[in-house]
Swiss-Prot record:
The chain crosses the membrane at residues 176-193. It comes from the Viruses. Residues 194-268 are extracellular. Plays a role in virus cell tropism, and may be required for efficient virus replication in macrophages. Induction: Expressed in the early phase of the viral replicative cycle. GO terms for cellular component: host cell membrane; membrane. Keywords: Early protein, Host membrane, Membrane, Transmembrane, Transmembrane helix. Belongs to the asfivirus MGF 300 family. This is Protein MGF 300-1L. Residues 1-175 are cytoplasmic. It is found in: Host membrane.
Amino acid sequence: MVSLTTCCLKNIVNQHAHVENTVLLYHLGLRWNCKTLYQCTQCNGINYTNSHSDQCKNKDLFLMKVIVKKNLAVARTLLSWGASPEYARLFCRNTEEEQALNVQHVADMSSSKILERLTMSYKENDEQLLITFYLLNLSTNFSTNLREQVRFNIVSYIICDLAIHQTFKTFYAKNYSLSTLYCIFLAIYYKLYTALRKMVKIYPGLKPFVYLTGFIFDDETVMETYNSTDDEISECKNRIIAIKGCYGNFHCRSDIDHMYAFSQNDYW
């Protein structure tokens, strides 16, 4: 059943989406980046045109973004339109924000549900990978124990090849988190270029990592887009070429016991 709040917001945005009413729309959480928000009746996503298109946005991903940007008015609207209160609570920075969004009594998202995203969600589409990226990199409410579980799962599923090892280790040493590198790696491996572009926009310093990972998989699109002539990158690229010459093409592995052995021997 559609809530009264949802019906009211829909009626307001349909009748008052005019320039002279922007103050009202902002106050009600119906404006974002100078554009009026609509809920798509076809895919249930969010758009700016009140018509379905490939530009419709995932509500949960949009919710994470607006909370990070501290726009609680829009966050309340998205929650009334069906966005996940579990995600909202994960991104609230304090109890005041939880109370403002009325999510202080929402149960914590289970660790298993979050960890499942590492192995399943990124195979679907760009938006699902971006949700995983936001959860692992921008949420402030992960426990230390959960972060260690995430770290172990990432190490467990990363490609077990010397070239990937070398590339990850180079940028991990630069204080980039393993989860950030992992999400970017997945975007390249599954050719989710929209997600890749948005992640690199947040971490522009990782363009060399993107280029090298694209080079490992012979992805011409990635190599052309993120081409780099940095000396350190050239050196790392030469090592990859040497490794390719010795071991040939690369393949994915998910041998947890094998990767656990690496993780216990200063692999990272």
